[in-house]
């Protein structure tokens, strides 16, 4: 379906109706030009089904990961503590998935308070995820490249680091909590997005560029640096066991980037276009709007993928899961002995003990 948009009022109504849940901001600049807008978007029922599956898989998988790590208290490593917090963040976000699913179908019917809270949870999940992965990369870099027991081996320091990550993630996410509002224009579904008032372009630049610089780009550079030197050390020293055990961490980082990097790149392109750093055309505007919808779904999918990684390539996770079942009498000791896979302990390899 195509709609001729000839003034700001019509455009505003169309955007709220068709892109109610897109994170991209509606164009409100004075020089906004009329466009022939293509409103064909992803099938909302398919999106609802995807969100429902993500909710179920994430709820089950991340709860299981937390149980396995909490049960293996005696041999819990520093990386396990970080991954425990990562599972907590994904589980917290998963609890909001039913709300996102309903909003795709009916618009935002939950009011402004829940609009603020759910948006805050989404951003906290994103920032805490990449900051925790950056901390893991630093820990592995110091432990393998410099072959030393880092200060983070002290359990109480790890807890303070995790608390600091949660606090920083909350600070970086506060703009979404402060500025998100629900609007219900006539003949249109209610929407939840930032109300920036005047000077929209300036505030959009601040709210997008600064948090993503400190909460995404810088942690990403830290990860690339640390894992680059870590991989070089592993290959040069022929540390076979450490290399195999590091597969889980590398897989977690790779999946995070595959899920969230496309969304952030599209969001950056949208910001540059809306602030006139790059030329804005009707075709480019429509392409970016569609890309925001698609890549946001990919980002949401991330919350259920880490447990799948642990189950398929995390030897110690499978061992910990079987051990937990045996302790509860759900499987026999003989079954545990026969099916338990060989693991690499953190004492000999200095890698995650439970995953």
Swiss-Prot record:
Single biological process term from Gene Ontology: calcium-mediated signaling
Alphabetized InterPro entries for the sequence: CCR1-9-like, Chemokine_CXCR1, Chemokine_CXCR_1/2, GPCR_Rhodpsn, GPCR_Rhodpsn_7TM
Gene3D superfamilies recorded: Rhodopsin 7-helix transmembrane proteins (1.20.1070.10)
Tissue-wise expression: Neutrophils.
Gene Ontology MF annotations: C-C chemokine binding; C-C chemokine receptor activity; interleukin-8 binding; interleukin-8 receptor activity
Claim: Glycoprotein is one of the keywords in the record: yes
Subcellular location: Cell membrane
Cytoplasmic face of the membrane: 68-73, 139-159, 233-247, 314-355
Signal peptide range: none
Keywords: Cell membrane, Chemotaxis, Disulfide bond, G-protein coupled receptor, Glycoprotein, Membrane, Receptor, Transducer, Transmembrane, Transmembrane helix
S-S bonds: 115-192
Transmembrane intervals: 41-67, 74-92, 115-138, 160-184, 205-232, 248-270, 291-313
Subunit structure: Interacts with IL8. Interacts with GNAI2.
PANTHER family cross-referenced by the UniProt entry: C-X-C CHEMOKINE RECEPTOR TYPE 1, CELL ADHESION MOLECULE
Family to which the UniProt record says this protein belongs: Belongs to the G-protein coupled receptor 1 family.
Free-text function comment from the UniProt entry: Receptor to interleukin-8, which is a powerful neutrophils chemotactic factor. Binding of IL-8 to the receptor causes activation of neutrophils. This response is mediated via a G-protein that activates a phosphatidylinositol-calcium second messenger system.
Protein name per the record: C-X-C chemokine receptor type 1
Gene: CXCR1
């Amino acid at each position: 379906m195509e709609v001729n948009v000839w003034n700001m009022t019509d455009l505003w109504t169309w955007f709220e109706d068709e892109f109610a849940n897109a994170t991209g901001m509606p164009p409100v600049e004075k020089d906004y030009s009329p466009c022939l807008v293509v409103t064909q978007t992803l099938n909302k029922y398919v999106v609802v089904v995807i969100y429902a599956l993500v909710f179920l898989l994430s709820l089950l998988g991340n709860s299981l990961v937390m149980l396995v790590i909490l049960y293996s208290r005696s041999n819990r490593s520093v990386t396990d503590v970080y991954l425990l917090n990562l599972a907590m963040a994904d589980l917290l976000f998963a609890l909001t998935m039913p709300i996102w699913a309903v909003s795709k179908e009916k618009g935002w019917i939950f009011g402004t308070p829940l609009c603020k809270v759910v948006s805050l949870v989404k951003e906290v999940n994103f920032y805490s995820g990449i900051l925790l992965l950056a901390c893991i990369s630093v820990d592995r870099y110091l432990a393998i490249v410099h072959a030393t027991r880092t200060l983070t081996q002290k359990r109480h320091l790890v807890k303070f680091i995790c608390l600091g990550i949660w606090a920083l993630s909350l600070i970086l996410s506060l703009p979404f909590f402060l500025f998100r509002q629900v609007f219900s224009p006539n003949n249109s579904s209610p929407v939840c997005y930032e109300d920036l008032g005047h000077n929209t372009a300036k505030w959009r630049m601040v709210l997008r560029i600064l948090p993503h610089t400190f909460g995404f780009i810088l942690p990403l550079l830290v990860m690339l640096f640390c894992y680059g030197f870590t991989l070089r050390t592993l290959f040069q020293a022929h540390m076979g066991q450490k290399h195999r055990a590091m597969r889980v961490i590398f897989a977690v980082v790779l999946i995070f980037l595959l899920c969230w990097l496309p969304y952030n790149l599209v969001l950056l392109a949208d910001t540059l276009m809306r602030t006139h750093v790059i030329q804005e055309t009707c075709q480019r505007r429509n392409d970016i709007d569609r890309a925001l919808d698609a890549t946001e779904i990919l980002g949401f999918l991330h919350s259920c993928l880490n447990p799948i990684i642990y189950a398929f390539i995390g030897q110690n996770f499978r061992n910990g899961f079987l051990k937990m079942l045996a302790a509860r009498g759900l499987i026999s000791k003989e079954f545990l002995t026969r099916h338990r896979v060989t693991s690499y302990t953190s004492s000999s390899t200095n890698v995650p003990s439970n995953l």
